[in-house]
Regions:
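N-terminal beta-loop-helix "entrance" segment that forms/cooperates
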Residues: 76-81
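Alpha-helical cap/lid subdomain in secreted, periplasmic
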Residues: 6, 84-241
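N-terminal secretory signal peptides and thylakoid transit peptides that target proteins
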Residues: 2-19
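Hydrophobic h-region of N-terminal signal peptides that target proteins for export
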Residues: 20-27
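Serine-esterase "nucleophile elbow" of acetyl-processing enzymes
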Residues: 28-75, 86-94
Length: 241
């Protein structure tokens, strides 16, 4: 009987040791797995893209600390971005954050497939983006469009003001973080003036006061990063200063 009890105790101890060893192996393996990078999707028009906007500069600030999913497309408005299927791609990319910036192609003169009303259809489009991003567990962040670098007696004309104001209202109503790039860009451009602002224009045969040179992209991306540190610190801390 004593031999049987001793055998049982030895077996129990060996079993416990095996369980603890196995648990330790799995724990070590889990610790060794690389952490999933934060995924940041960019939804917008050409001023958000890699080649003509602040997209590439933003991705550089994010660096290896996250994954930038560039889904902005030139010529898109808050209406056409959905109609073209690009918003579906944003949702399918399963991002943690979505930066949403539209306005330039929502203005009159862009045609019925793109134009929106800043009092009705534009805020409705933004609100729908917000709701659908949240439905998949992503955090939407609204970004007002940067101002065009068109001056009148030292002041920016600010044609995009109604769309920027509409975005602010949606952000307030939906309790969504807002990067007011429109206001920040106007303040900067009027401070440095037309001559210095021209350095933000991309090189080309025709004047372009809408899109960005590499320097302009870096400046706008830095403003966005600065604002994100205020309104969405969890994302902002991932962006280099």
């Amino acid at each position: 009987m004593q031999t049987l009890n001793l055998t049982r105790r030895v077996f129990a101890r060996l079993s416990l040791a095996l369980i603890l060893t196995t648990f330790g192996i799995f724990s070590a393996a889990a610790d060794a797995l690389p952490a999933r990078k934060v995924r940041v999707a960019l939804a917008g028009d050409s001023t958000v893209t890699t080649t003509a906007g602040w997209g590439a500069a933003f991705e550089k600030l994010l660096g290896a600390r996250g994954e930038c999913i560039q889904l902005a497309r030139g010529g898109q408005s808050s209406k056409s971005f959905r109609d073209s299927g690009m918003w579906k791609k944003v949702i399918e990319s399963k991002p943690d954050y979505v930066l949403i910036q539209f306005g330039h192609n929502d203005m009159p003169g862009k045609g019925p497939n793109r134009e929106t009303d800043p009092a009705t259809t534009y805020p409705e489009n933004l609100a729908r983006f917000v709701d659908e991003a949240r439905a998949i567990g992503a955090k939407p962040i609204l970004v007002t469009s940067m101002a065009r670098r068109t001056f009148d007696k030292g002041k920016i004309r600010g044609e995009l003001a109604p769309w920027a104001e509409a975005a602010r209202k949606v952000a307030a109503e939906k309790n969504v973080p807002l990067v007011d790039l429109f206001a920040r860009s106007i303040a900067l451009l009027e401070k440095i003036g037309p001559e210095a602002s021209a350095e933000f224009d991309p090189k080309g045969d025709k004047p372009d006061h809408t899109h960005l040179s590499p320097k302009g992209a870096e400046v706008m991306a830095a403003i966005i990063a600065e604002e994100l540190r205020k309104v969405e610190p969890a994302l902002g801390k991932l962006l280099a200063e």
